[in-house]
Amino acid sequence: MNIVLLGAPGAAKGTQAQKLVAEYGLAHISTGDLLRAAVKAQSELGIKAKEYMDAGQLVPDQLVIDLVKERLSADDAKAGFILDGFPRNTAQAVTLDFELQNMGLKLDAALLVAVEPEVIVERLSSRRTCKECGYTAPAGTEICPNCSGEMYQRDDDKPETIRKRLDVYENQTSPLIEYYKGHGILKEVNGDRPVDEVFADVKTLLSL
């Protein structure tokens, strides 16, 4: 099964992705991780991406698509994949569909993990992040349980910043949701519940 994962920052869609990976052996393809790995490896695509990132510019869609195509050719993606962080808009979705078709692939579902904005604001503004390893934990956690590093509140986890991020997400993603709805593959799950309840619904929606 090939899935595009949709959801606002803080919707805990990554948690659902991890559970799908663990239970069904799907490849979790995060475009953010792909970009960081390519830059670190100094691959041809990574060097190109770094030029844009260093200049504070968005990495062009085609470059991201090329990274995704490269990743999809890996053996672990043969059983299916979860694409996380791309596409972000309708133009990217159209390009992705075209490239997947050229590879003999198609999307089976666009899974939207939906959570009310104020729930997300409360979730994100109450979390702390480790300065050393990036581990996240609830407010009040001063020492990282993973590596004993110092915990802090990221600037983008402050309520006013979160609301701005959610506005940007809404403006970008609403047309994308309509795009996948029009293609008959949108599956929406209420993410404002315990993780295992959400996952049970995800499996039902995806007929797994």
List PLM regions with ranges.
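Glycine-rich phosphate-binding loop of ATP-dependent small-molecule kinases
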Residues: 1-208
